[in-house]
Protein backbone atom coordinates (compact mmCIF):
# COMPACT_ATOMS: atom_id res chain seq x y z
CA UNK A 1 0.00 0.00 0.00
CA UNK A 2 1.45 3.32 -1.15
CA UNK A 3 0.55 5.21 2.02
CA UNK A 4 2.42 2.70 4.18
CA UNK A 5 5.46 3.06 1.95
CA UNK A 6 5.53 6.82 2.56
CA UNK A 7 4.91 6.62 6.30
CA UNK A 8 8.45 7.48 7.38
CA UNK A 9 8.62 10.47 5.01
CA UNK A 10 5.30 11.77 6.35
CA UNK A 11 6.50 11.46 9.92
CA UNK A 12 9.67 13.35 9.02
CA UNK A 13 7.38 16.15 7.81
CA UNK A 14 5.65 16.13 11.20
CA UNK A 15 2.51 14.44 9.90
CA UNK A 16 0.55 11.63 11.51
CA UNK A 17 -1.52 9.19 9.46
CA UNK A 18 -4.83 7.42 10.02
CA UNK A 19 -7.37 5.90 7.64
CA UNK A 20 -11.08 5.42 8.26
CA UNK A 21 -13.29 2.80 6.65
CA UNK A 22 -16.83 1.49 6.95
CA UNK A 23 -15.38 -1.98 7.49
CA UNK A 24 -15.40 -3.88 10.76
CA UNK A 25 -12.42 -4.27 13.07
CA UNK A 26 -11.94 -7.86 11.88
CA UNK A 27 -11.88 -6.87 8.20
CA UNK A 28 -9.41 -4.06 8.81
CA UNK A 29 -7.24 -6.32 10.94
CA UNK A 30 -7.13 -8.89 8.14
CA UNK A 31 -6.26 -6.21 5.58
CA UNK A 32 -3.55 -4.70 7.78
CA UNK A 33 -1.96 -8.09 8.33
CA UNK A 34 -1.97 -9.00 4.63
CA UNK A 35 -0.57 -5.64 3.49
CA UNK A 36 1.76 -4.90 6.40
CA UNK A 37 -0.09 -1.76 7.51
CA UNK A 38 1.27 -0.25 10.74
CA UNK A 39 -0.60 3.07 10.95
CA UNK A 40 -4.07 3.26 12.60
CA UNK A 41 -7.02 1.91 10.60
CA UNK A 42 -10.26 3.20 12.13
CA UNK A 43 -13.39 1.04 11.93
CA UNK A 44 -16.54 3.13 11.38
CA UNK A 45 -18.84 0.20 10.73
CA UNK A 46 -22.03 2.24 11.12
CA UNK A 47 -20.59 5.02 8.90
CA UNK A 48 -21.48 7.67 11.49
CA UNK A 49 -18.12 9.47 11.34
CA UNK A 50 -18.11 9.17 7.56
CA UNK A 51 -21.54 10.82 7.42
CA UNK A 52 -20.45 13.53 9.87
CA UNK A 53 -17.58 14.48 7.57
CA UNK A 54 -20.09 14.77 4.70
CA UNK A 55 -18.49 12.10 2.53
CA UNK A 56 -21.02 9.24 2.78
CA UNK A 57 -21.50 7.75 -0.67
CA UNK A 58 -25.28 7.89 -0.97
CA UNK A 59 -25.16 6.51 -4.52
CA UNK A 60 -24.25 3.09 -3.08
CA UNK A 61 -27.64 2.90 -1.35
CA UNK A 62 -29.48 4.21 -4.42
CA UNK A 63 -27.91 1.42 -6.46
CA UNK A 64 -29.69 -1.25 -4.42
CA UNK A 65 -32.85 0.77 -3.75
CA UNK A 66 -36.20 1.09 -5.50
CA UNK A 67 -34.66 2.94 -8.45
CA UNK A 68 -31.83 0.46 -8.99
CA UNK A 69 -32.93 -0.19 -12.60
CA UNK A 70 -33.00 3.49 -13.52
CA UNK A 71 -30.33 4.08 -16.21
CA UNK A 72 -29.24 7.33 -14.54
CA UNK A 73 -28.76 5.55 -11.22
CA UNK A 74 -26.81 2.77 -12.91
CA UNK A 75 -24.58 5.35 -14.60
CA UNK A 76 -23.95 7.02 -11.24
CA UNK A 77 -23.12 3.65 -9.68
CA UNK A 78 -20.54 2.96 -12.40
CA UNK A 79 -18.93 6.37 -11.81
CA UNK A 80 -19.14 6.79 -8.04
CA UNK A 81 -19.42 3.26 -6.61
CA UNK A 82 -18.26 0.29 -8.68
CA UNK A 83 -17.71 -0.66 -12.30
CA UNK A 84 -19.02 -4.10 -11.32
CA UNK A 85 -22.45 -2.78 -10.28
CA UNK A 86 -24.22 -2.12 -6.99
CA UNK A 87 -23.96 -4.48 -4.04
CA UNK A 88 -25.47 -4.25 -0.53
CA UNK A 89 -21.97 -4.87 0.89
CA UNK A 90 -20.85 -1.50 -0.50
CA UNK A 91 -23.58 0.53 1.23
CA UNK A 92 -21.98 2.78 3.82
CA UNK A 93 -18.75 3.47 1.94
CA UNK A 94 -17.32 6.98 1.82
CA UNK A 95 -16.28 8.88 -1.26
CA UNK A 96 -12.54 8.12 -1.34
CA UNK A 97 -10.29 11.03 -0.54
CA UNK A 98 -7.76 12.64 1.76
CA UNK A 99 -8.17 15.28 4.47
CA UNK A 100 -5.26 17.24 5.89
CA UNK A 101 -6.11 18.18 9.49
CA UNK A 102 -4.16 20.44 11.84
CA UNK A 103 -3.51 19.88 15.55
CA UNK A 104 -6.80 21.58 16.42
CA UNK A 105 -8.80 19.17 14.26
CA UNK A 106 -9.41 21.79 11.56
CA UNK A 107 -9.42 20.61 7.94
CA UNK A 108 -6.76 22.62 6.11
CA UNK A 109 -7.05 20.95 2.70
CA UNK A 110 -8.83 18.07 1.01
CA UNK A 111 -8.31 15.95 -2.09
CA UNK A 112 -11.24 14.08 -3.65
CA UNK A 113 -12.03 12.79 -7.14
CA UNK A 114 -15.30 12.38 -9.03
CA UNK A 115 -14.53 8.94 -10.45
CA UNK A 116 -14.21 6.48 -7.56
CA UNK A 117 -11.32 4.59 -9.17
CA UNK A 118 -9.12 7.67 -9.47
CA UNK A 119 -6.94 8.23 -6.40
CA UNK A 120 -4.28 10.80 -5.56
CA UNK A 121 -1.11 9.18 -4.29
CA UNK A 122 0.38 10.31 -1.00
CA UNK A 123 3.45 11.77 -2.68
CA UNK A 124 1.29 13.56 -5.25
CA UNK A 125 -0.61 15.25 -2.43
CA UNK A 126 2.68 16.21 -0.79
CA UNK A 127 3.97 17.75 -4.01
CA UNK A 128 0.74 19.72 -4.43
CA UNK A 129 1.12 21.06 -0.90
CA UNK A 130 4.69 22.12 -1.62
CA UNK A 131 6.31 19.63 0.75
CA UNK A 132 9.87 18.70 -0.05
CA UNK A 133 10.51 15.22 -1.43
CA UNK A 134 13.69 13.35 -2.17
CA UNK A 135 13.49 12.76 -5.94
CA UNK A 136 13.20 9.11 -6.94
CA UNK A 137 14.08 7.69 -10.37
CA UNK A 138 15.24 11.19 -11.29
CA UNK A 139 16.52 12.40 -14.64
CA UNK A 140 19.03 15.24 -14.34
CA UNK A 141 20.10 17.56 -17.12
CA UNK A 142 21.87 20.81 -17.80
CA UNK A 143 21.81 23.21 -20.74
CA UNK A 144 23.50 26.53 -21.37
CA UNK A 145 20.53 28.22 -19.71
CA UNK A 146 19.41 26.07 -16.78
CA UNK A 147 19.73 22.91 -14.71
CA UNK A 148 16.78 20.57 -14.19
CA UNK A 149 15.80 17.46 -12.28
CA UNK A 150 12.73 15.58 -13.51
CA UNK A 151 11.14 12.74 -11.55
CA UNK A 152 7.80 10.96 -11.02
CA UNK A 153 6.01 11.32 -7.71
CA UNK A 154 5.67 7.51 -7.67
CA UNK A 155 7.73 4.68 -9.12
CA UNK A 156 4.71 2.35 -9.34
CA UNK A 157 1.09 3.05 -10.25
CA UNK A 158 -2.13 1.12 -10.71
CA UNK A 159 -5.59 1.52 -12.19
CA UNK A 160 -6.86 5.07 -11.56
CA UNK A 161 -3.65 6.38 -9.96
CA UNK A 162 -3.32 10.17 -10.10
CA UNK A 163 0.38 11.01 -9.93
CA UNK A 164 2.72 13.76 -11.10
CA UNK A 165 5.87 14.22 -13.09
CA UNK A 166 7.79 16.92 -11.27
CA UNK A 167 10.33 19.26 -12.80
CA UNK A 168 12.72 21.16 -10.53
CA UNK A 169 14.35 23.95 -12.54
CA UNK A 170 17.21 26.27 -11.61
CA UNK A 171 17.82 29.04 -14.17
CA UNK A 172 21.45 29.99 -14.77
CA UNK A 173 22.98 33.26 -13.53
CA UNK A 174 21.11 36.28 -14.92
CA UNK A 175 18.79 33.92 -16.80
CA UNK A 176 15.02 33.70 -16.72
CA UNK A 177 12.45 31.39 -18.31
CA UNK A 178 8.87 32.26 -19.06
CA UNK A 179 5.77 31.64 -16.95
CA UNK A 180 2.11 31.40 -18.03
CA UNK A 181 0.96 34.69 -19.53
CA UNK A 182 4.22 35.28 -21.39
CA UNK A 183 2.78 33.52 -24.44
CA UNK A 184 0.63 36.62 -24.99
CA UNK A 185 3.84 38.47 -25.88
CA UNK A 186 5.15 35.72 -28.13
CA UNK A 187 7.41 33.88 -25.66
CA UNK A 188 7.41 30.12 -25.05
CA UNK A 189 6.26 29.14 -21.56
CA UNK A 190 8.29 26.39 -19.90
CA UNK A 191 6.45 23.09 -19.68
CA UNK A 192 6.17 19.41 -20.54
CA UNK A 193 4.96 18.21 -23.92
CA UNK A 194 4.10 14.58 -23.18
CA UNK A 195 3.13 12.03 -25.80
CA UNK A 196 -0.40 10.78 -25.13
CA UNK A 197 -0.26 7.28 -23.57
CA UNK A 198 -2.91 4.70 -24.44
CA UNK A 199 -3.99 3.99 -20.86
CA UNK A 200 -3.72 7.39 -19.19
CA UNK A 201 -4.77 10.99 -19.63
CA UNK A 202 -2.62 14.06 -19.23
CA UNK A 203 -3.86 16.90 -17.03
CA UNK A 204 -2.80 20.55 -17.37
CA UNK A 205 0.57 21.55 -15.91
CA UNK A 206 0.48 23.21 -12.48
CA UNK A 207 2.77 26.23 -12.13
CA UNK A 208 4.00 28.08 -9.05
CA UNK A 209 3.58 31.81 -8.65
CA UNK A 210 5.85 33.78 -10.98
CA UNK A 211 7.40 37.24 -10.81
CA UNK A 212 7.16 40.13 -13.24
CA UNK A 213 10.33 40.95 -15.16
CA UNK A 214 10.78 44.34 -16.78
CA UNK A 215 12.67 44.16 -20.08
CA UNK A 216 13.73 47.75 -20.65
CA UNK A 217 14.82 47.57 -24.33
CA UNK A 218 11.26 46.63 -25.35
CA UNK A 219 9.51 48.30 -22.40
CA UNK A 220 7.89 44.94 -21.56
CA UNK A 221 6.59 43.51 -18.30
CA UNK A 222 6.58 39.71 -18.56
CA UNK A 223 5.90 36.88 -16.02
CA UNK A 224 9.06 34.82 -15.52
CA UNK A 225 10.98 32.51 -13.19
CA UNK A 226 14.49 33.55 -12.16
CA UNK A 227 14.97 31.43 -9.02
CA UNK A 228 14.62 27.67 -8.51
CA UNK A 229 11.02 26.48 -8.99
CA UNK A 230 8.97 23.32 -9.54
CA UNK A 231 6.23 22.59 -12.05
CA UNK A 232 3.96 19.54 -11.88
CA UNK A 233 2.62 17.61 -14.85
CA UNK A 234 -0.21 15.44 -13.55
CA UNK A 235 -0.99 12.10 -15.18
CA UNK A 236 -4.10 10.02 -14.42
CA UNK A 237 -4.14 6.31 -15.19
CA UNK A 238 -7.42 5.30 -16.80
CA UNK A 239 -9.79 3.49 -14.48
CA UNK A 240 -11.98 1.63 -16.97
CA UNK A 241 -12.11 -2.10 -17.63
CA UNK A 242 -10.20 -1.86 -20.90
CA UNK A 243 -7.31 0.00 -19.26
CA UNK A 244 -7.17 -2.62 -16.53
CA UNK A 245 -7.06 -5.37 -19.15
CA UNK A 246 -4.18 -3.66 -20.98
CA UNK A 247 -2.30 -3.03 -17.72
CA UNK A 248 -2.59 -6.70 -16.77
CA UNK A 249 -0.38 -7.56 -19.76
CA UNK A 250 2.34 -5.00 -18.95
CA UNK A 251 5.01 -4.72 -16.29
CA UNK A 252 5.75 -1.02 -16.76
CA UNK A 253 4.67 2.14 -18.55
CA UNK A 254 7.12 4.53 -20.20
CA UNK A 255 6.03 8.14 -20.64
CA UNK A 256 7.94 10.09 -23.26
CA UNK A 257 7.97 13.71 -24.29
CA UNK A 258 9.95 16.92 -24.23
CA UNK A 259 10.81 19.72 -21.86
CA UNK A 260 10.01 22.94 -23.71
CA UNK A 261 11.31 26.36 -22.74
CA UNK A 262 12.74 29.65 -23.91
CA UNK A 263 15.39 31.44 -21.87
CA UNK A 264 16.61 35.02 -21.91
CA UNK A 265 19.18 37.04 -20.05
CA UNK A 266 19.21 40.80 -19.57
CA UNK A 267 20.23 41.42 -23.16
CA UNK A 268 19.47 38.39 -25.35
CA UNK A 269 16.52 36.04 -25.87
CA UNK A 270 17.74 32.63 -26.95
CA UNK A 271 16.00 30.28 -29.36
CA UNK A 272 13.28 28.02 -27.90
CA UNK A 273 14.61 24.66 -26.68
CA UNK A 274 13.12 21.15 -26.73
CA UNK A 275 14.81 18.54 -24.50
CA UNK A 276 13.73 14.85 -24.75
CA UNK A 277 12.69 13.30 -21.43
CA UNK A 278 11.23 9.94 -20.45
CA UNK A 279 9.91 8.33 -17.29
CA UNK A 280 9.21 4.68 -16.56
CA UNK A 281 6.84 3.60 -13.79
CA UNK A 282 6.02 0.05 -12.73
CA UNK A 283 2.44 -1.16 -13.10
CA UNK A 284 0.65 -2.98 -10.28
CA UNK A 285 -2.80 -4.53 -10.29
CA UNK A 286 -5.37 -3.66 -7.59
CA UNK A 287 -5.75 -5.91 -4.53
CA UNK A 288 -9.40 -7.02 -4.58
CA UNK A 289 -9.08 -9.81 -2.03
CA UNK A 290 -11.59 -9.06 0.69
CA UNK A 291 -12.41 -10.53 4.08
CA UNK A 292 -16.08 -11.00 4.94
CA UNK A 293 -17.67 -8.08 6.74
Predicted segments with their positions:
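Extracellular/lumen-exposed scaffold segments
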Residues: 126-293
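C-terminal/domain-terminus segments
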Residues: 113-131
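Short, solvent-exposed loop/turn and secondary-structure capping segments
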Residues: 30, 112, 179-181
Amino acid sequence: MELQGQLEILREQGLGVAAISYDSVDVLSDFAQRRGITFPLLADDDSSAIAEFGILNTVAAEGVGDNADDPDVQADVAKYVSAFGANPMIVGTPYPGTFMIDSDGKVTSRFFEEFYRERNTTTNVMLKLGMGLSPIAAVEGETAHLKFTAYPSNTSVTVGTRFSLALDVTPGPNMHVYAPGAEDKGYRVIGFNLDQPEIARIAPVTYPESEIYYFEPLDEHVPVYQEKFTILQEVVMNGDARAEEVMSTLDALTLTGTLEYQACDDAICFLPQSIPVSFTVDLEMPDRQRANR
